[in-house]
Amino acid sequence: MKRMHECLDHMDEGIGRVSEIFPDLPVQEVVLTRLLLLVGGTLLGELESKLKPYGLNDSDFRTLMMIYSSPTGSATPTELCEYAQQGATNMTRIANVLVKGGLITRATSAEDRRRVVLSITTAGKRLVRKILPPLFPNVHGAFASLSAADKRTLDRLLRQIAVNIDTLTQPDAGP
C-alpha cells in the first residue's frame, strides 16, 4: 500500500472532482466516511496479519474475545451474533473453527435444552493471553499522536456516529 499521506491526498482529490459533478455532495461527511473506512480497513488488515499464524481472522478472534470477556466465560450463538454483528451462518462457521481449535466448547444449556452455550476452554484462555500483549504496541502506536483529551473526544464522537448509523439502519432503535 502506498504511504498513508499519498492515499489521503488521492482521496481528497477524487472527492473534490466528484463534488464538481455533484454539487450537493456532502463533501465533509464523505471525507469523514472515507477516513473511517480507510483507518478501519488498515487496522483490520494489521490485526488479521497478526492473527493469521494462529489460524484466526478478525471475526473469529472477536468472538473468542467476547466469550473470554463475558462474566461466565460463555455465551449463546444468538448473543454473539447480535454483539459481534455476524449472521447465524457465519457464527456457525466461527463456532466450528473455535471448537475445532479446542478454544471453546459447544454444549446444551442446563436451563433450556433448546439453547446452545459456547464456553471458553483453558486452551482458549491461554491463546488469548498469548495473542493480546503483542497487539498492544500497534494499538498504542495508532493513537500515539493523540492526547488523552483527544482520545476521549474521538471515543465520544465515534459512539455518536455508531448510534446515528444504528438509528438509520434500524429505525426502531433509539438512544
Language-model-detected regions and their locations in the chain:
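Charged, amphipathic alpha-helical coiled-coil/dimerization segments
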Residues: 96-156
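N-terminal helix-turn-helix DNA-binding core of bacterial DNA-binding proteins
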Residues: 27, 37, 41-87, 169-175
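DNA-binding alpha-helical recognition surfaces that contact promoter or target DNA
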Residues: 65, 93, 156
